[in-house]
Design a protein with these regions (language model features):
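Generic beta-structure capping elements
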Residues: 50, 105-108, 175-177
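Basic, Lys/Arg- and aromatic-enriched nucleic-acid-binding interface segment
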Residues: 58-72, 76-78, 91, 95-155, ...
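N-terminal core-binding DNA-recognition domain of tyrosine site-specific recombinases/integrases
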Residues: 4-94, 110
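Short clusters of hydrophobic/aromatic residues that line enzyme substrate/ligand-binding pockets
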Residues: 37, 100-103, 192
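Basic, alpha-helical nucleic-acid-contacting "clamp/cap" segments
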Residues: 123-127, 131, 161, 168-192
Length: 192
């Protein structure tokens, strides 16, 4: 809790804070949260990471989990959070070494993402009869915008005037992003 309230609040973006807070609340605090820092060893962390693979996934914000049990990817995200927390504990001189640095992590299968071809995009544009969705598809693919960036766009960030297009100076400037976060994360980061 101290790590999150001192380090996390001042360092992380809102969505990162919320994600890491959820990992801590659901998978770290209930399992190893009562242990003394000095009692945590690399061997114990190896067992903890192995055992996490048989922990049921917690549903967050009424979203259905994508798998029944924690995946190796989620265990690696938990490891990244713990590595950062223990590094901070070393800097704060609470412990002399980071017990997760040499821990063994589960292997993660890397899957290639399916990427739409020009033909798939063309077909999607043909069948799309909603002008706003059509605009969103065009923006997403022509400007490589993520959904949060698209939803954060305002007219003051866009110059598509005919003369700008003619002279090659048309632009879309992304300086805002819409993020889905909980009320708790908003409250914790209200001073940011």
């Amino acid at each position: 809790d101290e790590y999150m309230s001192i380090y996390g609040v001042n360092t992380w973006a809102m969505s990162t804070y919320e994600s890491r807070r959820g990992l801590a609340r659901n998978y770290i605090t209930p399992i190893i949260g009562d242990m003394l820092l000095s009692d945590i060893t690399p061997r114990m962390m190896d067992k903890y990471y192995r055992d996490l693979l048989s922990v049921k996934t917690v549903s967050v914000n009424n979203r259905k989990p994508t798998s029944e049990y924690l995946t190796p990817h989620t265990v690696r995200e938990i490891h990244k959070l713990l590595r950062s927390a223990f590094n901070q504990a070393v800097r704060w001189e609470l412990i002399s070494r980071n017990p997760v640095l040499n821990a063994t992590l589960p292997k993660e299968e890397h899957k290639e993402r399916d990427i739409w071809t020009a033909e798939t995009l063309s077909k999607a544009m043909e069948v799309c009869d909603d002008p706003i969705l059509s605009l969103a598809l065009n923006l997403a693919f022509s400007c490589s915008l993520r959904i949060g960036e698209m939803l954060g766009l305002t007219w003051d960030c866009i110059d598509i005037a005919p003369q700008s297009i003619e002279n090659g100076s048309a632009y879309i400037f992304v300086n805002k992003e819409l993020q889905r976060v909980t009320r708790g994360a908003l409250d914790d980061l209200s001073d940011k």
